[in-house]
Amino acid sequence: MGRTRKANVCPRLSRRALGFYTRDAGVVQRTNLGILRALVCQESTKFKNVWTTHSKSPIAYERGRIYFDNYRCCVSSVASEPRKLYEMPKCSKSEKIEDALLWECPVGEILPDPSDYKSSLIALTAHNWLLRISATTGEILEKIYLASYCKFRYLSWDTPQEVIAVKSAQNKGSAAARQAGTQPPVLLYLAVFRVLPFSLVGILEINRKVFENVTDATLSHGILIVMYSSGLVRLYSFQAIIEQFMQQKLDLGCACSQGGTTGTVGEAPFGIPCNVKITDSPPPLFEVSSLENAFQIGGHPWHYIITPNKKKQKGVFHICALKDNSLAKNGIQEMECCSLESDWIYFHPDASGRIIHVGPNQVKVLKLSEVENNSSQHQISEDFVIWANREDRKENLITVTASGRVVKRNVNLLDDDPEQETFKVVDYEDELNLLSVVAVTQIDAEGKAHLDFHCNEYGTLLKSIPLVESWDVVCITTGTLSCKGFLYKRHLLGHVLVSPDSPVP
């Protein structure tokens, strides 16, 4: 394993008090986070359950705020005990919030309204309104009516904190049409906005006549990603599509005529017409075939991860260079495990270019580096591995032959055997630079879990925190570490455990 060194925060506190870091705000921030990490990970720090609540709807968490009742109620988890920030008035089912993103003030931009400098929740309602809500008071600051010709359902960042994409539900047509083998020409719509102040980029339709056999599409970092039933994934330049196929430029709040109807763009009942209609298939920037359209890009230099497009290849991952599609040395990664649930792989979110490969009993962190004496080729190697705490257990399988002879054979158990410690969640805490891992062991009818903090650089175990309550494996959704503690959430019950109750080391 890597180096282990117990950090003492007292010298850093003394230097901070003497003003050693006053000339550089970034150094102050990093110093404060280093102190916090030392407090969180020290052996004497104890975490306790300070607050419990119930929710019939899923619980969401963003930057120290916990959202209940479809984002209608917001609770701050920053204080020593969570407190309610606001609760919006009750609304009908058609007005509930379907999805939301937290927007935070950009640096260096002059905004038109003082309220724009405070965090906002960008929310999408069930009846196609896009709202900007104050993250501290719940007041609705802006509202845009999208359209009546489709049902918008999903929000995502195209460019984080700058451009959002609002995606509609897929148009599958009526049951009678499907039975007759006919499909509506438009699969879905993508509405794209620049945020603060809100401005419309355009609404794009994904047409089955242009993108034949298309099954889904999304937008990320200016790239339109289109997925096909054959497993093919194609990438297109969204900017080039806008320049070539935009029918008319639309501005929010301005008058517009469409199909004989006149109205104001972004106001009900007119909404926003679809103004980007692709008539010819644009040239793709890149295409690749992958099982279940699974495709990721990352690393330094750019590489991508796919699974070969054959069912028997499930669980096999190929890591290839984006520039020439060449397979990296040791680029075929297959975790030799026998389990009911598949392992998963993704580029590390810390922008180090590393790769995280998670299986039921191990977490591999892989690094991408140049091949010695060949700078044009790259190789995959292990940076470190986190292993589950398990016993080497085998069961005897007894078989009786036709002649009556008894044959005993050793049989290995499943790698995700619930009675063995199994990894369920792996998450990265960027501010404290910690890799957090949740491991679960099923004991009788209840599951016991613990949350481990590992050094993101070396994989060293820094802290293990048992979760006292039983853990229902079926209901696990995610684990999130905040600056003062952590939240683990379930569909019916959420617990927030915060504030180390121990002296400074």
Swiss-Prot record:
Q: What Pfam families does the database record attribute to this sequence?
A: DCAF17
Record field: transmembrane: 186-206, 222-242
Could you mention a single GO BP entry for this protein?
protein ubiquitination
Pathway field of the UniProt record reads: Protein modification; protein ubiquitination
An example of a Gene Ontology cellular component annotation for this protein is:
membrane
Q: Which InterPro entries match?
A: DCAF17
Hey, what's the signal peptide range on this chain? Answer: none
The subcellular localization recorded is: Membrane; Nucleus, Nucleolus
UniProt keyword terms in alphabetical order: Membrane, Nucleus, Transmembrane, Transmembrane helix, Ubl conjugation pathway
> Which superkingdom, per the lineage?
Eukaryota
**How does the protein's chain sit in the membrane according to the entry?**
Multi-pass membrane protein
Would the keyword Membrane be found if you checked this record's keyword annotation? yes
Q: Which PANTHER family match?
A: DDB1- AND CUL4-ASSOCIATED FACTOR 17
- The protein's role, per its UniProt record: May function as a substrate receptor for CUL4-DDB1 E3 ubiquitin-protein ligase complex.
Subunit record text:
Interacts with DDB1, CUL4A and CUL4B.
Q: Which protein is depicted?
A: DDB1- and CUL4-associated factor 17
The organism encoding this protein is Rattus norvegicus
